[in-house]
């Protein structure tokens, strides 16, 4: 299906908002209307089927800008995204009881606020990041003050999961092949970089001529020092997130090898961001594309769309739909807040909805219950013009942050 709803221009400088679903909450609509009023938005805002209200900007939005960038639209989990790889294993080769595999992964990969006791990542990953980070810190020493034990923390967090909706999964596809899939971002330093520059943009907006419809939409104009510094920092955080997922995948495979028959990694491997900004060309224009909870879906480009814990996930191939700026959804999308989910559901509900999956089933993860998310099959049906399904995955083991 294609565009299902268009919010037409409501102000002199506003652009249309093109939405690939009918299921859009009123708060998201109001957020999108405000963003559409920014004079540097190009052509239109595209909204994916997993849309829901977000902090700073609407989750599921694709924001094309010319000569400006909005730090809050990228957010604080800069470079958050997915990594998946197919193994040369069949489902029948997995043990009946997956608890030992889960224990082995949890011992190898710190989750939540935890970090490695020693730096685990290889020097080939650390050194390039360290060299690129030095000039950023020199220009903005305030970043160091925002993160305890700065150098040790960012290095020891490389190869760690984090919390919230971040996860590690073992999945089975339609051919009974085994996949490892994970979801994580740029960890503590990415959060610090995002927070620091969001506040800097708000501070600078107070002294800039021109109306901003919401302080969360404060921006840096191209040509300014802050614009250049933010682009440098956000690109660093995106690379860190990419390397974090690579390192985690290495550790996971290292953890499960002793417990499984000999296996190889296949060439089907994907590592993609879904909270990020990049320079791209669309409609013949050089643009900054911010994907806030959306993945790139260029022609035949592979991507990952995870469902909620207990639902299906998808490996997809892009169709390069121009109206979406070559994008698609990044998941199912929440249909309620975490606090509301904790009120509506209990531990028994979680146990019932995750039956057959090796995962946490305690009250601490009730906010991640499948019913708190939109129906992934409906989300996928709404974006058939954007992507083609390559593989359908079903989780058998899930580790939450």
Language-model features, listed with the residues they occupy:
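Domain-length cofactor-binding catalytic modules of enzymes
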Residues: 2-31, 40-45, 53-59, 63, ...
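Beta-strand elements of modular eukaryotic interaction domains
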Residues: 36
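A generic, well-ordered mixed alpha/beta core segment in the N-terminal half of proteins
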Residues: 73-139
